[in-house]
Amino acid sequence: MAMRSWTPDQGFVDRKLVRPASVSTSLSLELCTFPSTLGSSVAANALEQLLVVEKSLQGDYFTCNEEVKTFLKDITVAVKKLEEMRKNTIELLEIESMELSRLYFLLETVPNSMHKELQECILEARRLNILEISQVKGKIEKTNDEIKFLNDKIIELKNMNEALGIKQVELAKQHAKFVLLLNQTLEEKAVATICINDTYTRIKFEKEEIGLQKQCLQDATDLIEKHKQEHRKKKERLAERIKDVKQSCEEKRKEAYNKRKELTRLQNKIIKMKQTVTTNAVMINDKSLEIMRLRETADLWKKKVEDMKRVCESLEEKLLFFLTHKQQIDSVSSEKKSGFISQIQQVAEKLQKINKENKDLRDRLNTLLKQYKITLKEEEAMSLQRQKMAEEHQKQMELLNQKETFLTQRKLDIKNMEEGFSTLRDLNVATKEVYRKQIKLLTENLERELQRWVVNQWRLLCSRKRHSRWLHKTKLTLRKIITEIEIAEEKRRQLLKETKRRQKEISRFVNQIETIKEQLEVEEKEYIKKEKKLMKELNKYEDLIIKEAQINKVKEEQLVETLPRLQIAEDDFQEKSRTLKSLQNDISAKKQEETLLSTYIFRYRKDIIRCTNNTETVKRDMRHIRTLESEKTQSHFEALKNLENEIYVNDQKLALLILENKKLRDYLAYLKKHTKEYSEKQIVTVQNSGDLSWQLIAQHSQYSDLLAEFQIKIKELVDTGEETLQEIRSLASKLRYRDEKIESISAWLLGGIERLHSLMEEESPSSLSKEDLQKAGMKQKEEKTLRFSPSLHTRRDTLSRNCKMIKKRSRSPKNKP
């Protein structure tokens, strides 16, 4: 990819070429090149895109949370600081290159021999750099192998999961079998309890029989006590012998230690004798180990005797209890004596075996004493040999004194030679130290750049993962929001339809109410007219009744004729009164209907107002959500652009990492599917058998632990990103320190070069004598053996060749005259 540099005047400039370093060297000192931005195109591209983000933040269209704004502003400030630090480093490197070019120019004035030596030093430094690069590549290959190994482990874990699924089914089957087995075992336990009760009764009878046998053991205890006394006496004798042996061993060890101190001063022959002494010491140690084994056996016998004592005490306590039962068991004991006599004979045989073992131990002690005497004789012979070696040692010490005198003379000669070659040594050492420091700095820079590259790639992968997750989440949220919006729109349409329908119904009800009001008014008027007519008729009838009451007596016959008419009139009156009541009830019902309609109309109006308010709030929320979504999409799109601009090196490796990421995603999806399957299986198993639920819970906890470990690793890798800024700051401080060192070195080199020029002018090459050159050569060889590392054999060869050439040149002018 093309490199892009940023400047405050022109902004970002595309530069496809690579600018060489501003260092003037000879043909053999061609240094590497570096890009225009010194590997900081990532920061430049990030700054360009963050400027776009700042513009969008300042605009009205771009709206987002305050936290996001602060986060982006902090990023812009950090990137600006990085850019400033980058510029400072570039300036420092340019100053460094100028100073190095000046130093190289001064070095060209140095004689050819020094110039060639410096060239060879630089070539070897480059070779060392190549070796270090190869080592780094080897480490990368190792990491790739580790990644492959982890992939193999993942495949194995998959197989393990499949095997666990099969085992789970088998465990479910086994659970059913175990339930049946439990039922069987419970039945067997019931049978066993019955058997235990029977055996308990039998054991009681057997205990009574054992009491009889213990009486017979009393005789055996008497014999055992006699043997114990004899054994104690033997033990005391052995302890006295062991003490004597220990004292003699300690004395001999002290003598051997004093003699070893004397033997350390000897040289080659004494070393051989040491080997023989060590072999003898090993033999003595083996014998001491055998003595320790005998002690352990004695301790074991002590423990056995104590156990027997305990048994005897327990038997004595039980004998008191059994004496009371003696009279009852005398009749039975006579029959079983024969069996117990046979047991007593077995005990006697065991005692005989123990006596045999004691005899074997005595034989071993005798053999050890014999071996000890043999070792004493060998040590006496060794003492004679040591005396002989001491005499030889004195002779060798005299030879060493002679050699030391010779070496002192040689050292004086070497010191005289060192004084003539000290100036050249100092120059050589200084140049080596400078080049070593430069090589170290270059290696550190290379390692840091590799670490940054790895960290940036890892951040890319993490950011892509996060972005993919965020996209997935946003898509889901958008789908949910879209569905909710569609539902809200459908509800809004339904509400509009219902409001229209209700308005139409309300208008109908209003029209009906108005018509009903008009009808009621007409009916009321008619009813009033009818009431007036009826009142008039009633008045007439009352007058007639009064008249007829007065004339009742006279006109009883006429009343008989008028009775049917009265009945008809009464019926009409009752019917009219009923019609009045029904009309009154209808009027009250219609009034209630009017009140209900008014309440319904009021409620519908409130609902319509609420719907309108809700639609406005929903619209506002939709607008706010759309703005947030647009802001987020723009911010993430810009972040993607930043990340794409940062990827300019090692596209093949990045593709491989992406493939691995896809594999990991597939594997995570596969694990999620398996977790879902396991959860479903868990539900089934819980329904079938509650005892197997803990296994599924354990598996789920393992998966959660793995995810937690993965998240912890991600956090650790994120924390390493903060360390990169600190490394940049430390690099700037180191560069300043390096500038100061280079200034001091340059001043020192200028003084040394001026001295060399003065020496070259004062003394010609012909004036150099053979002795000075020989001293210089010897000094150079000695310096090689003392100062140079084994990796600089080639440099030694070149220096030796130069010395030979100087010798030939010095001899040639002497031979000519």
UniProtKB/Swiss-Prot annotation:
Domain of life: Eukaryota
Region of interest: Disordered: 761-817
Disulfide bonds: none
The entry's keywords: Coiled coil
Start-end of Basic residues biased regions: 804-817
Coiled coil (UniProt feature): 130-166, 217-594
Record InterPro entries: CCDC175
Composition bias, Basic and acidic residues: 769-786
UniProt key word Coiled coil: yes
Protein name: Coiled-coil domain-containing protein 175
Source organism (scientific name): Rattus norvegicus (Rat)
